[in-house]
Amino acid sequence: MSAKAQNPMRELKIEKLVLNISVGESGDRLTRASKVLEQLSGQTPVHSKARYTVRTFGIRRNEKIAVHVTIRGPKSEEILERGLKVKEYQLRTKNFSETGNFGFGIQEHIDLGIKYDPSIGIYGMDFYVVMGRPGGRVSRRKRCRSTVGNSHKTSKEDTIAWFKQRYDADVLDK
């Protein structure tokens, strides 16, 4: 912190971390991917369905094709740290959205420190991080809903600065 005390309501925080494994088909591979997410997060993953039929990929509408899990709190920070270690704390500017969220993918889940199990195999996964500030709930709640001012919304620049400072990381301009 600088000499002048920062406003605690302006501090960025991780609202949630979403881990997604998109298998592209239902069946045994999807249940094995579900086990990987359960091992990693300790929570039961949710299945995602296909929105529409794509004959070239062999996907039917409403067929379960992916699994994801939402993690909040300190556990999300710990899992994110493991994911960033795999990426060697380097992300690109295009990994960050205009609303201040960011995401990245890894090729192999065993890089996260999970022991390899031949019956499960190796899966890649996507990490999506939703950033926010205290007071952001006023725009989402049902009763007495209000708007958040532009100066209080999270921006791409704010998140990049937070990311560099928090994880001592690099953001590449590729």
Swiss-Prot record:
Keywords, sorted A to Z: Cytoplasm, Nucleus, Ribonucleoprotein, Ribosomal protein, RNA-binding, rRNA-binding
Entry keyword RNA-binding: yes
GO cellular component labels: cytosolic large ribosomal subunit; nucleus
Biological process, per Gene Ontology: translation
Family matches, as InterPro entries: Ribosomal_uL5, Ribosomal_uL5_C, Ribosomal_uL5_CS, Ribosomal_uL5_dom_sf, Ribosomal_uL5_N
Record has Nucleotide-binding as a keyword: no
Main localisation: nucleus
GO molecular function: RNA binding; rRNA binding; structural constituent of ribosome
Cell compartments where the protein resides: Nucleus; Cytoplasm
SUPFAM superfamilies, A to Z: RL5-like (SSF55282)
Alphabetical list of Pfam families matching this protein: Ribosomal_L5, Ribosomal_L5_C
Function (record text): Component of the ribosome, a large ribonucleoprotein complex responsible for the synthesis of proteins in the cell. The small ribosomal subunit (SSU) binds messenger RNAs (mRNAs) and translates the encoded message by selecting cognate aminoacyl-transfer RNA (tRNA) molecules. The large subunit (LSU) contains the ribosomal catalytic site termed the peptidyl transferase center (PTC), which catalyzes the formation of peptide bonds, thereby polymerizing the amino acids delivered by tRNAs into a polypeptide chain.
Family: Belongs to the universal ribosomal protein uL5 family.
Quaternary structure, from the entry: Component of the large ribosomal subunit.
Annotated protein name in UniProt: Large ribosomal subunit protein uL5
Organism of derivation: Eremothecium gossypii (strain ATCC 10895 / CBS 109.51 / FGSC 9923 / NRRL Y-1056) (Yeast)
Gene that this sequence comes from: RPL11
